[in-house]
Structures are given as structure tokens and as C-alpha cells.
């Protein structure tokens, strides 16, 4: 069979690859944490980061066992603690979802928010790839307008909640999720605004919102 490979890196752009011995198939990831970063070894910190960045990853992630309150303390059960939802609402077809499904997903994202006025399900695979669900929030006054409520994902991995340059400024009051592998990451806002796919995505979102508002009013 194929030889096992060991990848090593000391936290800089350089790395080494070498053949090694491994008894079982699969990938082991071993990280060494410095004394100053020991808080990253705490279960609560690990689960916090996994939940933030991998909450909707398409591959099941297990972090220890679920806990239950017993005899005055939390104790591990025999049930795996699954961090993520591998099949979130925005990855499914609109025809497979009910209004209750959309409401449940909104509550999962924003448990303290009022019910939204309406939602828009994005599902495009040409000429760019874009999926997502956007919600138009209920706003009682101008002081309740909150931005940075749209979460950007790339293949179900969380990237950021700062979508300026992708979503028009006047639509950043929307809530929800957009997922696209065609949006370049780690680039400047000006570069984003000049990217052809980003321009198309921005125009598509604007049109979908305008169409929904037109249907209502």
C-alpha cells in the first residue's frame, strides 16, 4: 500500500514532508501549544472555537462525550458530543424545507431576535456558486438596526461576519448566511469590490431582496 507521510511545521510558512510508519489508516494531527497559549487546551476553549468555525462543517466533528448533571456535578455520558450540524438548512433545496425549518434555523442563529419579516433562499450554481438564507429582520426603530449579522461561509466553514464589499452597504442590516467558494478570502475590500464573481453575487442578492420587497408591498 501507499506509504504514510508526516507533515511538520513550526508555525511559519516553511514545512517538511517525510515518509513515516503508521499502523492504521487515517490522519493524526498533533499540535504543540506554548505556555502562553495553554488556555487553548481547555475543553471550553476548544469547543468554543469548534462551534464558531465548524458549526456547519459537512463532516461530523466529535469533541468528547456529552455531559449530564449527576450527584452535584457534570459527568460524562456514553453519548458522543457532536459539535456540528452537517446538513444545515441553506444546503438543502427550498422545496425540502417548511416555514418551520426556516424559523428554526433563524432561532439557531439569533435566539434573542424577533421573528423576521421574510426570508430569501439563495441557490445558484452558475455562473457562480452561491447558497444561503437571508432574513429581513423586524425593526421597530432606527436604533435597533444592527450590522454584521450576515455570516460568510466557504464550503460550510465559517469565514467572517464582516461582508462589506460582498453585500451592498444598504443591505448589511440583513441577517443570515451566505456560502460561496467563489468569494476570494484574505483580500482587501477594494479587491473584493472589483472581483467579477463578487460583483455578480452582490447584484444577485440585491435583485432577490428587491423582488421579495416588491412581492410584499
Feature-to-residue mapping (PLM):
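GHKL-type ATPase core
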Residues: 1-72, 81-82, 154-157
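Glycine- and acidic
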Residues: 31-32, 88-90, 152-160, 187-194, ...
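Generic, well-ordered alpha-helical scaffold segments in large soluble proteins
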Residues: 32, 49-53, 105-109, 173, ...
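Short loop/turn segments at secondary-structure transitions that flank enzyme active sites
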Residues: 35, 140-142, 184
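Hydrophobic/aromatic-rich, well-ordered segments within soluble, folded domains that form packed cores
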Residues: 43-62, 164-186
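GHKL/Histidine-kinase-like ATPase module
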Residues: 44, 71-178
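Extended, well-ordered alpha-helical scaffold/bundle regions in very large, multi-domain proteins
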Residues: 185-217
Amino acid at each position: 500500500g501507499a506509504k504514510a507521510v508526516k507533515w511538520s511545521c513550526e508555525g511559519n510558512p516553511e514545512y517538511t514532508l517525510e515518509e513515516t510508519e503508521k499502523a492504521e489508516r487515517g490522519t493524526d494531527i498533533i499540535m504543540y501549544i506554548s505556555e502562553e497559549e495553554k488556555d487553548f487546551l481547555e475543553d471550553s476553549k476548544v469547543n468554543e472555537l469548534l462551534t464558531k468555525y465548524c458549526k456547519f462543517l459537512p463532516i461530523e466533528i466529535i469533541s468528547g462525550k456529552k455531559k449530564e448533571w449527576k450527584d452535584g456535578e457534570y459527568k460524562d455520558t456514553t453519548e458522543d458530543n457532536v459539535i456540528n450540524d452537517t446538513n444545515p438548512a441553506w444546503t438543502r433545496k427550498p422545496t425540502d424545507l417548511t416555514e418551520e425549518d426556516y424559523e428554526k434555523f433563524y432561532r439557531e442563529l439569533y435566539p434573542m431576535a424577533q421573528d423576521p419579516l421574510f426570508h430569501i433562499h439563495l441557490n445558484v450554481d452558475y455562473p457562480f456558486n452561491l447558497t444561503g438564507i437571508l432574513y429581513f429582520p423586524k425593526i421597530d426603530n432606527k436604533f435597533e438596526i444592527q450590522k454584521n449579522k450576515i455570516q460568510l461561509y466557504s464550503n460550510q466553514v465559517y469565514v467572517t461576519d464582516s461582508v462589506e464589499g460582498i453585500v451592498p452597504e444598504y443591505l448589511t442590516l440583513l441577517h443570515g448566511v451566505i456560502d460561496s467558494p467563489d468569494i476570494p478570502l484574505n483580500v482587501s475590500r477594494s479587491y473584493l469590490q472589483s472581483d467579477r464573481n463578487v460583483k455578480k453575487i452582490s447584484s444577485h442578492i440585491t435583485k432577490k431582496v428587491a423582488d421579495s420587497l416588491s412581492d410584499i408591498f
